């Protein structure tokens, strides 16, 4: 099981970029457009669709993965992996323990948590979700994690195209038509194709 515990602090595409793509003139004061609220809702919707389609995290966000037991090689979903914040487990007595970082290594290239040399995993109680791994994922840009230059340009282009499709079909969106029914845009899929993660978590 996996859950996102912290959403991205901002979006890969700004309102100004979306306006430019949609050819919406800023006509209000301060510079605004009557559809700004709608576009601001469509941007995260488009980003989430593209993240789900590729199996990636675009901007820095926090995830938790819950496992029934430790494994020697644990691949973390929704790459790229930035860092592992903590690993907790339920011991044989039923108490929650924090695992020392000396027991494992983190490979941010392959998005994996590995057992460190000479170490052994602690015993866990035989219950569901006995192990919880909390980690940061997303395109990291050092001191400025929300710097959009860390996002591949093809992904930004796909999000903008998705925003455009959602905006053009906003009546269908409001009527509840699903993205999968509406999104036949082969260009979006072609742009995202190189960034898709396979079912084993490989990139």
Regions found by a protein language model. Name each.
Residues 1-203:
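Divalent metal-cofactor coordination and adjacent catalytic microenvironments
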């Amino acid at each position: 099981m996996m859950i996102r515990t912290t959403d991205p602090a901002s979006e890969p595409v700004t309102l100004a970029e979306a306006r430019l793509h949609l050819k919406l003139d800023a006509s209000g004061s301060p510079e605004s457009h009557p559809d700004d609220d709608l576009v601001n809702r469509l941007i995260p919707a488009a980003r989430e669709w593209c993240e789900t389609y590729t199996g990636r995290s675009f901007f820095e966000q926090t995830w938790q993965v819950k496992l029934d037991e430790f494994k020697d090689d644990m691949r973390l979903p929704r790459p790229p992996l930035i860092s592992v914040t903590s690993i907790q487990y339920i011991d044989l007595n039923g108490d929650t323990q924090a695992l020392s970082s000396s027991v494992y290594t983190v490979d941010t290239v392959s998005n994996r948590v590995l057992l460190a040399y000479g170490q052994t995993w602690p015993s866990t109680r035989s219950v569901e979700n006995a192990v919880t791994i909390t980690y940061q994922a997303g395109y990291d840009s050092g001191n400025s994690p929300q710097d959009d230059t860390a996002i591949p340009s093809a992904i930004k282009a796909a999000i903008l195209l998705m925003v455009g499709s959602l905006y053009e079909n906003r009546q269908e969106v409001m009527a509840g038509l699903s993205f999968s029914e509406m999104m036949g845009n082969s260009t979006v899929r072609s742009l995202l194709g190189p960034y898709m993660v396979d079912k084993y978590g490989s990139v």
